[in-house]
């Protein structure tokens, strides 16, 4: 199938097969599509509505192009979400990565610089002193030796440069926004994945299962957050080890936590968020701590280190208050200096 044939099919509101989408995405990532073609296809897919097979095929093509790592650990967690919820909150999933690592989880945090917010995971980590120029073998050592590593998306997904201009020109969410959490270069098979689109929660969990993930929670707050919201109930699609997907809702109260106001988790620029992340890992009590405890608890449930959210909160609190989570951040910073 050619790009023109694919575009004609999608414009006619016909779905691409998994194999067709893999081929077309492969052509785009190889630089064989013009920005106009990339933008037209992404727009047509969005207007039609991307199917499970189309997202799966696109993710498989992107995984095939990635610079991969192979951590020694069997259980590896990613907390990467789609971003793009427009809420401009603090980097909750980034903080969760260090808390989970402090609790004993091996974490391969996939992330990028900000797209729609003021500060993405790469921005806050760079402000903290984590190098974005780490060689891949150094990142692999971070994961194996320290239990946490940061996989800077542009370093591992260089082929995305071929679609970058079209994505900037489009200015809206497209299939590309869905792919980051589905294409962890370390092959993490356990995930806490927040999505900006509540309609995609169950679909995304099914795609993860077909991609080989073992367990995952895909979450979307009823208030629109692409996290487990500390401010409201949250929709969850849980991928279980048998491949089944179960949906339910959770609330802060389920974890023994109080609801916090949205302003408690508002984000700032990279320097401000870096200061707040340090304070959080130093044990500061705040609404932000509540948000991180709630999401870290879910991460611990996903990997099997916590029986339920309340148990997860207790273990996340211990990881922070013992200094273990802070030590994980310090190790990542110091590792980039060696």
From Swiss-Prot:
<dbReference type="InterPro" id="IPR000312">
    <property type="entry name" value="Glycosyl_Trfase_fam3"/>
</dbReference>
<dbReference type="Pfam" id="PF00591">
    <property type="entry name" value="Glycos_transf_3"/>
</dbReference>
<keyword id="KW-0028">Amino-acid biosynthesis</keyword>
<dbReference type="InterPro" id="IPR035902">
    <property type="entry name" value="Nuc_phospho_transferase"/>
</dbReference>
<comment type="pathway">
    <text>Amino-acid biosynthesis; L-tryptophan biosynthesis; L-tryptophan from chorismate: step 2/5.</text>
</comment>
<feature type="binding site">
    <location>
        <position position="89"/>
    </location>
    <ligand>
        <name>5-phospho-alpha-D-ribose 1-diphosphate</name>
    </ligand>
</feature>
<keyword id="KW-0808">Transferase</keyword>
<feature type="binding site">
    <location>
        <position position="81"/>
    </location>
    <ligand>
        <name>5-phospho-alpha-D-ribose 1-diphosphate</name>
    </ligand>
</feature>
<dbReference type="GO" id="GO:0005829">
    <property type="term" value="C:cytosol"/>
</dbReference>
<feature type="binding site">
    <location>
        <begin position="109"/>
        <end position="117"/>
    </location>
    <ligand>
        <name>5-phospho-alpha-D-ribose 1-diphosphate</name>
    </ligand>
</feature>
<dbReference type="GO" id="GO:0004048">
    <property type="term" value="F:anthranilate phosphoribosyltransferase activity"/>
</dbReference>
<keyword id="KW-0822">Tryptophan biosynthesis</keyword>
<feature type="binding site">
    <location>
        <position position="112"/>
    </location>
    <ligand>
        <name>anthranilate 1</name>
    </ligand>
</feature>
<feature type="binding site">
    <location>
        <begin position="84"/>
        <end position="85"/>
    </location>
    <ligand>
        <name>5-phospho-alpha-D-ribose 1-diphosphate</name>
    </ligand>
</feature>
<feature type="binding site">
    <location>
        <position position="167"/>
    </location>
    <ligand>
        <name>anthranilate 2</name>
    </ligand>
</feature>
<comment type="subunit">
    <text>Homodimer.</text>
</comment>
<feature type="binding site">
    <location>
        <position position="81"/>
    </location>
    <ligand>
        <name>anthranilate 1</name>
    </ligand>
</feature>
<dbReference type="InterPro" id="IPR005940">
    <property type="entry name" value="Anthranilate_Pribosyl_Tfrase"/>
</dbReference>
<feature type="binding site">
    <location>
        <position position="93"/>
    </location>
    <ligand>
        <name>Mg(2+) 1</name>
    </ligand>
</feature>
<feature type="binding site">
    <location>
        <begin position="91"/>
        <end position="94"/>
    </location>
    <ligand>
        <name>5-phospho-alpha-D-ribose 1-diphosphate</name>
    </ligand>
</feature>
<keyword id="KW-0479">Metal-binding</keyword>
<dbReference type="GO" id="GO:0000162">
    <property type="term" value="P:L-tryptophan biosynthetic process"/>
</dbReference>
<keyword id="KW-0460">Magnesium</keyword>
<keyword id="KW-0328">Glycosyltransferase</keyword>
<protein>
    <recommendedName>
        <fullName>Anthranilate phosphoribosyltransferase</fullName>
        <ecNumber>2.4.2.18</ecNumber>
    </recommendedName>
</protein>
<comment type="similarity">
    <text>Belongs to the anthranilate phosphoribosyltransferase family.</text>
</comment>
<comment type="function">
    <text>Catalyzes the transfer of the phosphoribosyl group of 5-phosphorylribose-1-pyrophosphate (PRPP) to anthranilate to yield N-(5'-phosphoribosyl)-anthranilate (PRA).</text>
</comment>
<dbReference type="InterPro" id="IPR017459">
    <property type="entry name" value="Glycosyl_Trfase_fam3_N_dom"/>
</dbReference>
<feature type="binding site">
    <location>
        <position position="227"/>
    </location>
    <ligand>
        <name>Mg(2+) 1</name>
    </ligand>
</feature>
<feature type="binding site">
    <location>
        <position position="121"/>
    </location>
    <ligand>
        <name>5-phospho-alpha-D-ribose 1-diphosphate</name>
    </ligand>
</feature>
<dbReference type="GO" id="GO:0000287">
    <property type="term" value="F:magnesium ion binding"/>
</dbReference>
<keyword id="KW-0057">Aromatic amino acid biosynthesis</keyword>
<dbReference type="InterPro" id="IPR036320">
    <property type="entry name" value="Glycosyl_Trfase_fam3_N_dom_sf"/>
</dbReference>
<dbReference type="Pfam" id="PF02885">
    <property type="entry name" value="Glycos_trans_3N"/>
</dbReference>
<feature type="binding site">
    <location>
        <position position="226"/>
    </location>
    <ligand>
        <name>Mg(2+) 2</name>
    </ligand>
</feature>
<feature type="binding site">
    <location>
        <position position="227"/>
    </location>
    <ligand>
        <name>Mg(2+) 2</name>
    </ligand>
</feature>
